[in-house]
């Protein structure tokens, strides 16, 4: 597939997602990194977003709960170039009813070259990167070229 680029702004659009068994872990991480997160635009699936906003006071745009379509909403935002990175503390040991949605979300993040942190260690690396506060250029699929080839 042909590639093009897009500019990721210095003020990132960050998705915050956690399965039920990891909400407390994500909350702890957000509290520890509240100062670093304040300069960015935050999005979250419903239950997680309301919890994080209530407990930290951060402004978070809450979508629907994951099982009710929130994962798919995030995937759509990623496809539209409106999410720059995602912190997703998922539960690798327990299946959830919306596992196909989770897989689709991770697939679409990979397609559009969106960095995803799936645990505290990778989230720590991501949030502490000097690139967090810089404008950067990333490669993404050239969708118009893809469409032109298929029509």
From Swiss-Prot:
Binding residues for substrate: 19, 23, 45-48, 65-66, 98
Catalytic activity annotation: dihydroxyacetone phosphate = methylglyoxal + phosphate
InterPro entries xref list: Methylgl_synth (IPR004363), Methylglyoxal_synth_AS (IPR018148), MGS-like_dom (IPR011607), MGS-like_dom_sf (IPR036914)
Alphabetized UniProt keyword annotations: Lyase
MGS-like domain span: 6-151
GO biological process, one term: methylglyoxal biosynthetic process
Enzyme type, top EC level: lyase
Tagged with keyword Lyase: yes
Entry annotated with the keyword Glycosyltransferase: no
Location of the active site: 71 (proton donor/acceptor)
Organism superkingdom: Bacteria
CC per GO annotation: cytosol
MF GO annotations: methylglyoxal synthase activity
CDD domains, per database record: MGS (cd01422)
HAMAP family registered for this protein in UniProt: Methylglyoxal_synth
Similarity comment text for this entry: Belongs to the methylglyoxal synthase family.
Main function: Catalyzes the formation of methylglyoxal from dihydroxyacetone phosphate.
Protein name from the UniProt record: Methylglyoxal synthase
């Amino acid at each position: 597939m042909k590639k093009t680029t897009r500019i990721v702004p210095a003020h990132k659009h960050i998705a915050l997602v956690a399965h039920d068994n990891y909400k407390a872990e994500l909350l702890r991480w957000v509290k520890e990194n509240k100062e670093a997160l304040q300069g960015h635009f935050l999005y979250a699936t419903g239950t997680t977003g309301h919890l994080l906003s209530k407990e930290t006071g951060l402004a978070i745009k809450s979508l629907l709960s994951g099982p009710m379509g929130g994962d798919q909403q995030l995937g759509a935002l990623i496809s539209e170039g409106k999410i720059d990175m995602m912190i997703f503390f998922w539960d690798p040991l327990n299946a959830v009813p919306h596992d196909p949605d989770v897989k689709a979300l991770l697939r679409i993040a990979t397609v559009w070259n969106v960095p995803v942190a799936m645990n505290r260690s990778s989230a720590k690396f991501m949030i502490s990167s000097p690139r967090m506060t810089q404008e950067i250029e990333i490669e993404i699929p050239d969708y118009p070229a893809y469409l032109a080839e298929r029509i």
